[in-house]
Amino acid sequence: MHEFKKKIVLITGGSRGIGKAIAQAFALHGAYVVITYKKQKDQAEELIASLPGRNHICFQSDVTIDGEAEFVITKIIDKFGALDIVINNAGMYVNHPISKIAFNDWKVAWSSTLETNLIGPANICYHAAKHMMSVKQGKIINISSRGANRGEPDAPAYGASKAGINAMSQSLAIALAPYNIFVGVVAPGFVETDMAASSLIGEQGKAIRNQSPMQRVGKPEEIAKAVLMLSIDGMDYATGAIIDLNGASYLRS
């Protein structure tokens, strides 16, 4: 995949888990990687130092803050003079089952989840698209979830936010196609990351793995491969596609 050589790739929430695997994959194929992080400075800097190649950078950002998304895109353009690929990966998951939560906590869960998982990515899309429209090319890939379609009874705001990502992405795919801008979605099921490790222990872990007929969960590297696949120029006609990666644990008709 030499076509990624010297391409400028932004990965939000890129310091760990799926974002880390995506950063490693793009760097391996010669891209210049920019990752943003909210709190994990040490992890982000360690990752940047370990990536093959050069010109990779990381910086702190919280795109739920007003003006932050524009700052992120402007900073990248100022440094590199371009922005070729955007991966909206940053997200959050917080339990808030309606049967057990107080209303004030319910409201906080909804507002924080939607701000992080939907509004933040929408703002990044807006400012990235403005640049990409000016140069008539670019790719935006948003990370969604199986929960957008299957439902999340313990975290309904999470499911709603990811359903919003799907709808937004397909709307933008139509709006931006005349500008030669690709917009796609990768929607993983349960993925084995450091954050998810505690959920994969014992009987709970067995039950999660058994959701898939493959009797396992996904690997971050598998998600990264799907992102790379959508990012190549030969996939332009797949704009608007939502790629499910969940080991057949949930199949849409």
Task: Label each residue range with its predicted role.
Residues E70, Y93-S111, S134, D154-A157, ...:
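Conserved mid-core segment of classical short-chain dehydrogenase/reductases
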Residues A177-F182, A238-G240:
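Short, small/polar-rich loop/turn modules that mediate ligand/substrate recognition or access, typified
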Residues C125, S161, S169:
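Active-site helix of classical SDR
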Residues R150, L228, T239-S253:
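Short C-terminal tail/terminal secondary-structure segment
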Residues S145:
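Residue(s) in the substrate-gating loop at a strand-loop-helix junction
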Residues K130, I174-A175, D236:
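Alpha-helical segment proximal to the catalytic Tyr-Lys
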Residues M92, F103-A122, Q137, I141, ...:
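Catalytic Tyr-X3-Lys loop
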Residues I8, S15-G17:
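Conserved glycine-rich cofactor-binding loop
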